[in-house]
From Swiss-Prot:
Keywords: Metal-binding, Zinc, Zinc-finger. It comes from the Eukaryota. The gene is Trim43c. The keyword Ribosomal protein does not apply. A zinc finger (B box-type) spans 88-129. Residues 271-446 form the B30.2/SPRY domain. InterPro entries: B30.2/SPRY (IPR001870), B30.2/SPRY_sf (IPR043136), Butyrophylin_SPRY (IPR003879), ConA-like_dom_sf (IPR013320), SPRY_dom (IPR003877), TRIM/RBCC (IPR050143), Znf_B-box (IPR000315), Znf_C3HC4_RING-type (IPR018957). This is Tripartite motif-containing protein 43C.
Length: 446
């Protein structure tokens, strides 16, 4: 048998150096050190692969490897120790001098076969110790797996919140630069209004940043509470089988179920409030042109890769939810400055912007980020998001009426304006494109 070929290892070779318990799902790193899989992932307080070995501190340049052989040895040794315990004289039935090979689930004790037939235990549920151990371990592992999946989801929320905080800081910094650029084009200069606008932006940024950090702390707290229950389950699963069987785990299992059902914090969605720029719409209206959207093309939309968009033939059916009819202007622009407005009131989803003129004349051509310059509003569950051609979300208040589009061909950029509030939504960087572009828009109620 396989067990006969495996030598009984020393105690220290079965012990995880992190939890100091017997290995559960042992894995080893390139340096050769071995740990419980979950202990390794929880080592840095984040459920992710550590940057270095907890024992020798060598960098972890690759994923760990599951040690199947050691896992088998752990099982065999635990089973062997259980049998040694049951065969020992001190643990035999005092009354009948027989081995206690039967487990009473009601009393949570080990019995010999004669005691199990006694009147005291006649109405109780009995099973062999092998079956009892298997069932107890299966239930423990089931609870552990449920919490582990929950922990991974919560860790994703933690990482998402941290990414959002970093992007928020970057977004506010970029927006401050754009606002300075916009005010610099106003005539006469509005230095005082610009400074007030930037001060308001920074104040809102700091307030939101504090809320983001509180949100992250709440999610981390919830994750840590789950981790505590998980580690209790893990500690119990590492107990010798004979001790595990007689433990009353009802309270631990109850807390595990409650922890798995607690609503997880979803994190916050930050938004910059629209701030009016004096004279903005008046200045832009000096470049106003009338755009006729008379033609239409077909867009094939890939929800997995939102900007993998294809031009389709006019006869293509619109039955598919991934296919949309998009209106575009009769004229393209390569020189000058132009401003127009698109009424998007009441639309749940819309896209407005410009795209390279040669691209529109193609057939079955995939859009790349260098072909199209847009602002897109999407409904994401219970909130709206604004994104640009690179698929990056912008944490800006959604406009509720007309959206103004300012195209500067010499500067090579396009800007979007909330007309009702005379505020800047966002602006592409100067030099983004140097080619003929054509206006387009798409809007849908659903």
């Amino acid at each position: 048998m396989e067990s006969d070929n495996l030598q009984d290892p020393q105690e220290e070779t079965l012990t995880c150096s992190i939890c100091q318990g017997i290995f559960m799902d042992p894995v080893y790193l390139r340096c050769g050190h071995k740990f419980c899989e979950t202990c390794l992932l929880l080592f840095q307080e984040d459920i992710k692969f550590p940057a270095y070995c907890p024992t020798c501190r060598q960098p972890c340049n690759q994923r760990y490897i599951n040690d199947i052989s050691l896992k088998k040895q752990v099982f065999i040794v635990r089973k062997k120790r259980l049998m040694e315990y049951l065969n020992s004289e001190e643990h035999k039935c005092v009354t009948h001098k027989a081995k206690k090979m039967i487990f009473c689930d009601k009393s949570k004790i080990l019995l010999c076969h004669l005691c199990s037939d006694s009147q005291e235990h006649s109405g109780h549920t009995h099973c062999s110790i092998d079956v009892a151990v298997q069932e107890k371990m299966e239930e423990l592992l089931k609870h552990m797996d449920s919490l582990w999946q929950r922990l991974k989801i919560q860790q994703n929320y933690v990482e998402k919140e941290r990414r959002m905080t970093l992007w928020w800081l970057k977004s506010v910094k970029l927006r401050e630069e754009v606002i300075k650029r916009v005010y610099g084009k106003q005539c006469p200069p509005l230095s005082e209004e610009r400074d007030q606008h930037i001060e308001c932006l920074r104040h809102q940024s700091n307030t939101t940043l504090e809320e983001l950090r509180k949100s992250e702390a709440t999610i981390v707290h919830e994750r840590n509470q789950l981790t505590e229950v998980y580690q209790e389950l893990m500690t119990m699963s590492q107990r010798p089988y004979q001790e595990l069987l007689v433990q009353d785990l009802d309270d631990l299992f109850r807390r595990s179920k409650l922890a798995a059902k607690v609503d997880m914090p979803q994190g916050m969605i930050p938004r910059l409030r629209a701030h009016s720029i004096p004279g903005l719409t008046a200045r832009l209206n000096s470049f106003r042109v009338k755009i006729s959207f008379k033609h239409s093309i077909m867009f094939g939309y890939n929800s997995v890769r939102p900007f993998d968009i294809r031009l389709l033939h006019e006869s293509t059916s619109l039955d598919s939810a991934k296919t949309h009819r998009v209106s575009w202007g009769k004229k393209s622009f390569s020189r000058g400055k132009y401003y127009w407005e698109v009424d998007l009131k009441d639309y749940r989803r819309w896209t407005v912007g410009v795209c390279k003129d040669p691209w529109l004349r193609g057939r079955s051509y995939v859009v790349t980020p260098t072909d199209i310059f847009l602002l897109e509003c999407l409904r994401n569950k219970d909130h709206y998001i604004l994104i640009t051609r690179i698929g990056r979300e912008h944490y800006i208040e959604k406009p509720v009426g007309q959206v103004g589009v300012f195209l500067d061909c010499e500067g090579g950029y396009v800007s979007f304006v909330d007309v009702a509030k005379s505020s800047l939504i966002l602006s592409y960087s100067p030099g983004t494109f140097h080619c003929a572009v054509r206006p387009f828009f798409f809007a849908a109620y659903t």
